[in-house]
């Protein structure tokens, strides 16, 4: 079953030359004949390796500025030829068998990511010969090894040493899978790039936005298998995007604790994305993908203490996110006070990790400090389809708000309004958030009726003995009726921030005026479903 195949001849043609010299040296030292092209051949020759240019082997020169190098029967016949079946025809046409192909492709993704990249630049970085060789070798994996990742170089040499210069069929099959994944991702990038240019190329309207191509090709890499999904009867895995530049749960490093669950990852993402909204030291506590306590403070310890007070019951078994390094004092406060599933922060001090290590079930993640939020796409799976939209990075500043009531907000009310508006963006709709002195005091999430979300926020504050009088309230969408304002006023809210836009805005504003409430319109909605 091993079906070993000796590696006697290898063709090397790589764009990313990291590790290629050392790999070629190892192959040559084991008696492997080296074929190569262009820059790869020159590099290997400069390092003193015995290498045959493909053009010398085929008797056909590279041409058209390198566009045609390996597209030749003596190359592809050597790769595709079936050992034991095509030997006679290969011998007739002087085609030598090629046992290993080492190829990675022109850097198309890096090229189009560069500012000012032209269509001509992009086109010249579409690899033709490379993918053709990759697919040929992968198709004939029964006889040929295809290597597309430099991370496989060492393992290949080790297996050759363990198998007298041969590779097993299992290894060749695994390498073929990687090869097909590699070319599929490469072609997807090209298709997405060209698809994004359709509107401009054809002079179409803004509605035909290039961010949403006619065909959507997505490429994700499996990071880990999960024990189960959202529920124990569901199987699950976690896939990540390549080359993500922004700090995220997908790129975070787990420095402590047992494996993350499906729900851990979803909740940690919600907590981290919320805490990114704040410049001041901040803490976000999340339960079931909803913030249950958020605060900013003079330090992350202060912020945590205030966030916890919002809803200590819900904080139990929650996810905690910070936008500053986790320090020992804060870690001790958390461990002493509550059970926590995950703590995520840009970094964690050694002293903090010694403290959290006392609780083996606590997972600690570090994600690095983030900069500007990166625009991107959000996806929602529906049965038989996929909804795609821009990532919600919208936010408003004080200068963009419209005061629509007779009373102006005080400075503190305005600060609290902007604070709870940031939080409301991450609460499931219908979302209502009460805040006072830069901390949440009540959160009403996910109710079908907005007025009930407002009532729940008031009940939450009352249950924890938090004073609502003088607080601000944020609503993720407009109030369709005045009842939400009446409920807020009854609880003690004195300032409301909301998008506006209801056909009954006049009634809602009148209700605010009746109660002496200052009301701010953002002209921006933050539904979250």
Swiss-Prot record:
Protein's pathway: Purine metabolism; IMP biosynthesis via de novo pathway; 5-formamido-1-(5-phospho-D-ribosyl)imidazole-4-carboxamide from 5-amino-1-(5-phospho-D-ribosyl)imidazole-4-carboxamide (10-formyl THF route): step 1/1; Purine metabolism; IMP biosynthesis via de novo pathway; IMP from 5-formamido-1-(5-phospho-D-ribosyl)imidazole-4-carboxamide: step 1/1
GO molecular function terms listed in the Swiss-Prot or TrEMBL record: IMP cyclohydrolase activity; phosphoribosylaminoimidazolecarboxamide formyltransferase activity
Entry keyword annotation includes Acetylation: yes
InterPro entries: AICAR_Tfase_dup_dom_sf, Cytidine_deaminase-like, MGS-like_dom, MGS-like_dom_sf, PurH-like
Listed SUPFAM superfamilies: Cytidine deaminase-like, Methylglyoxal synthase-like
Family: Belongs to the PurH family.
Positions where N6-acetyllysine occurs in the chain: 287
Protein name: Bifunctional purine biosynthesis protein PurH
Sorted UniProt keywords: Acetylation, Hydrolase, Multifunctional enzyme, Purine biosynthesis, Transferase
A GO BP entry: 'de novo' IMP biosynthetic process
Signal peptide feature range: none
Entries under NCBIfam families matching the protein: PRK00881.1 (NF002049), purH (TIGR00355)
